[in-house]
């Protein structure tokens, strides 16, 4: 009897763990994806448009030879990308509106807008 209860507890524990993992998986996925390029310290497209109230995967390609840092004080986002590399990160969900972002290392020339519709 003791062995049956122990086996049952292990089975229930494994099922609960699988249920928890499967619930967490959708949180890792983005509801939308966009691409962003930085070249000559300028972001393209500018403005970047994304849907409101949606988790968005951003793929950022740095075509410069120097490191850039995608940064926004408006929505508290940031991501470092070395020269010639591509990184992905998530932003949102954000409310509808216009937000600013820039390259932290070249803020004065790299300001861009994020339009959330």
Enumerate the language-model features and the residues they cover.
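Short beta-strand/loop motifs in extracellular/secreted proteins, especially
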Residues: 56, 66-68, 110-112
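Sec/Tat signal peptide C-region and signal peptidase I cleavage site
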Residues: 23-29
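Bacterial N-terminal signal peptides that target proteins for export
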Residues: 2-13
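Extracellular/periplasmic metallocenter environments
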Residues: 35, 82-117
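Asparagine-centered strand-capping/turn motif at beta-strand->loop junctions
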Residues: 60-62
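Bacterial N-terminal signal peptides
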Residues: 11-22
